[in-house]
Amino acid sequence: MVMIGSAGVVAPGKWRWLRALAWLAILCVAAVAMFNLVAKAVSWLVTWAGGIAVTSASPAPPVFRLVAAIAGCIALIATYWAAVRFGEKRRVPELDLRHALSDLLLGLGIGAALLTAIVSVQWMSGWVVIEPRTVDRVAQALRDSIRSGVVEELVLRLVIFRLLWRAFGIWPAIAGAALLFGALHLANPDSSPFAAACLIAGEGIGIGLYLITGRIWSVIGMHAAWNFTQGWIFGATVSGITDIAGGPLALRPAHGIPDVLSGGGFGPEASLAALAVSLLASGALLFHALRLGRFVARDR
């Protein structure tokens, strides 16, 4: 079961819902700020140690930026652990390392399988074209995938979803987290209300995994593998961003096919195939969590 907290800043009493929301805002700012601070500091340190001059026209090598992103992710996780341990006066089972490897592998498999299913439907239907290409940019793809998996899921799942649950209950938390995730992507290149709807439909995947395991690791693995498979392996645009492409394949919309079928410039995740796969996966995982009794939280 998910532990949502019942002591410290979220202890029972007057204005508990408001205290939970204020704590949510503080954790979001602190976590993202720590990630950025440490990532930039480590990037500067490794480039300085390597004797490399970094400018806006000549950024740090991709491997150095990968190391910096991993350091930032570790700092973000540590910041969350410390804040919850002392601010909410409880242990932090959502970051239990004893199950981290198995959970990560589970999530990686689910993310890769779901994205492969989406692209397979598109390709077999003639909605996209897939061609071979020269392999490169793996370090950059790993950096972007790990960063999005850790930062987005820790903030959205462990902070926003969990504390909305604490404040208002599980159903408002599910709706609020899903709508926020979709809305945030409306600012991405080539986004649309339909693209946001597809992402909202897929939010049940991450929420379901979190409810079932009570931990964040499988959700991080799922998100990272989804992006890496979509962007690097298939060479597709990821949420309107093309930086990850560089793997063995290059995917593009077939000529004359509507964006709603191909995903257009936003990528395969903004397509009818993605909507269908995401709804099925979200429904299956949430139903399984409900059957396991995971819609009831642990306070301590």
Positions of predicted regions on the chain:
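N-terminal, membrane-interfacial amphipathic/helix-forming hydrophobic leader that caps
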Residues: 1-92, 231-300
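Cytoplasmic juxtamembrane interface segments
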Residues: 2-9, 84-85, 193-226
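Aromatic-anchored segments of alpha-helical transmembrane domains
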Residues: 29-36, 115-121, 178-187, 225-233
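Transmembrane alpha-helix boundary signature
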Residues: 86-93, 115-130
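Residue-level signature of the transmembrane alpha-helical core
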Residues: 100, 108, 112, 142, ...
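Function-critical hydrophobic alpha-helical transmembrane segments in multi-pass membrane proteins
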Residues: 130-191, 201-204, 208
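Residues that define the loop-to-transmembrane-helix transition and helix capping
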Residues: 171-172, 216-217, 269
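Interfacial aromatic-anchored transmembrane helix boundaries in multi-pass membrane proteins
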Residues: 183-197, 230-243
